[in-house]
Amino acid sequence: MDSSAAPTNASNCTDALAYSSCSPAPSPGSWVNLSHLDGNLSDPCGPNRTDLGGRDSLCPPTGSPSMITAITIMALYSIVCVVGLFGNFLVMYVIVRYTKMKTATNIYIFNLALADALATSTLPFQSVNYLMGTWPFGTILCKIVISIDYYNMFTSIFTLCTMSVDRYIAVCHPVKALDFRTPRNAKIINVCNWILSSAIGLPVMFMATTKYRQGSIDCTLTFSHPTWYWENLLKICVFIFAFIMPVLIITVCYGLMILRLKSVRMLSGSKEKDRNLRRITRMVLVVVAVFIVCWTPIHIYVIIKALVTIPETTFQTVSWHFCIALGYTNSCLNPVLYAFLDENFKRCFREFCIPTSSNIEQQNSTRIRQNTRDHPSTANTVDRTNHQLENLEAETAPLP
């Protein structure tokens, strides 16, 4: 949500991020742009320019960032981009490809992977913006990149919040869960989460624009007067609705689940189902915890910068970039967490990366089944393969 490209000349820019000296220039989307959230209450960089910090009319730190710093940031962004795109697209492929992966929880995970993939796809643009000190991609891409950052932040936290409520229902109200926790309902809720995210994403898209200043182009958010009021209103809304409220809901849900799990030995009447329920609950909890750890620093940083003046130092510059990078890093961590914490994802990832003869045979059997529906005369052939297929399915069935 950082709204601007870093200007090439910072000599007369002394208050771009709500304090008396320019903050380090993240990239157009850095903080996931929350950098916008550390807004600029009085901006000497230009009389009509307003920024929320970070990308929003970014000013680079006094003096250009060192080559080592720039290379380090670009290397980190490159790793996050490659791992994030590959990992999240793999997660989406696995959920679409394998029928047994189409559970309510995995439908939510698909939505999370989609939001993360979109966010990591903006990193190449932000890297170029950071290195060149200008935004060379035009107004349309400026609007798209900034809005994607906001959409990612809100959709991700809304989805995690939904997953926590879903886990609460599964653990504490198992009977009601039978009717409520269906893939169809999960898809409807995912659509609702994107619609809710549009309450911020669409206005931001309309506010984003490019501005020419001192030989460079800024990708920035523009606000109506009084700019300080609308800047701070946006920062407060993001902090409350994308952090405080979801974290409170998640905390309450898991608090109630912990009490339930401690007080009841058997939740479903089956040890196997119980083990599966606890495993999925643990995975969702870890994903939520990692998200909070990755996003808390930038939220806190933005609020502090909005309230007090922070003198620019090397430590401040490094910590700022670290907070921004940490937010983006979360987008590539989730697929890794699924691979380590969920046996079903682990097995599907392994089958995708290292196809085995049994996997190929199972796929061929599936094709034969489909052909038989179209050509009933081949029923005898299918009968001979059914026994093999059943054995293969038993061997490769997702672990509970």
Swiss-Prot record:
Cellular location(s): Cell membrane; Cell projection, Axon; Perikaryon; Cell projection, Dendrite
Residue intervals on the Extracellular side: 1-68, 132-142, 208-230, 307-314
Key words, A-Z: Cell membrane, Cell projection, Cytoplasm, Disulfide bond, Endosome, G-protein coupled receptor, Glycoprotein, Lipoprotein, Membrane, Palmitate, Phosphoprotein, Receptor, Transducer, Transmembrane, Transmembrane helix, Ubl conjugation
Motif extent (NPxxY): 334-338
Main location: membrane
Tissue spec: Expressed in brain. Isoform 16 and isoform 17 are detected in brain.
Sites bearing Phosphotyrosine, chain numbering: Y168
PTM statement from Swiss-Prot or TrEMBL: Phosphorylated. Differentially phosphorylated in basal and agonist-induced conditions. Agonist-mediated phosphorylation modulates receptor internalization. Phosphorylated by GRK2 in a agonist-dependent manner. Phosphorylation at Tyr-168 requires receptor activation, is dependent on non-receptor protein tyrosine kinase Src and results in a decrease in agonist efficacy by reducing G-protein coupling efficiency. Phosphorylated on tyrosine residues; the phosphorylation is involved in agonist-induced G-protein-independent receptor down-regulation.
BP term (GO), one: behavioral response to ethanol
Intrachain disulfide bonds: C142-C219
Residues lipid-modified (S-palmitoyl cysteine): C353
Outcome of substituting K273A: Impairs interaction with calmodulin
GO molecular function: beta-endorphin receptor activity; G protein-coupled receptor activity; G-protein alpha-subunit binding; G-protein beta-subunit binding; morphine receptor activity; neuropeptide binding; voltage-gated calcium channel activity
Carbohydrate-modified residues: N9, N12, N33, N40, N48
Topology feature Cytoplasmic, residues: 94-106, 166-185, 256-279, 339-400
Membrane-spanning ranges: 69-93, 107-131, 143-165, 186-207, 231-255, 280-306, 315-338
Membrane-related topology note: Multi-pass membrane protein
Positions of modified residues (Phosphoserine): S365, S377
Subunit structure and binding partners: Forms homooligomers and heterooligomers with other GPCRs, such as OPRD1, OPRK1, OPRL1, NPFFR2, ADRA2A, SSTR2, CNR1 and CCR5 (probably in dimeric forms). Interacts with heterotrimeric G proteins; interaction with a heterotrimeric complex containing GNAI1, GNB1 and GNG2 stabilizes the active conformation of the receptor and increases its affinity for endomorphin-2, the synthetic opioid peptide DAMGO and for morphinan agonists. Interacts with PPL; the interaction disrupts agonist-mediated G-protein activation. Interacts (via C-terminus) with DNAJB4 (via C-terminus).
Further information: OPRM1 is the main physiological target for most clinically important opioid analgesics. OPRM1-mediated inhibition of voltage-gated calcium channels on central presynaptic terminals of primary afferent nociceptors is thought to be one of the primary mechanisms mediating analgesia at the spinal level. Opioid-induced hyperalgesic responses are observed following both acute and chronic dosing associated with cellular excitation.
Similarity remark: Belongs to the G-protein coupled receptor 1 family.
Protein name per the record: Mu-type opioid receptor
Annotated gene: OPRM1
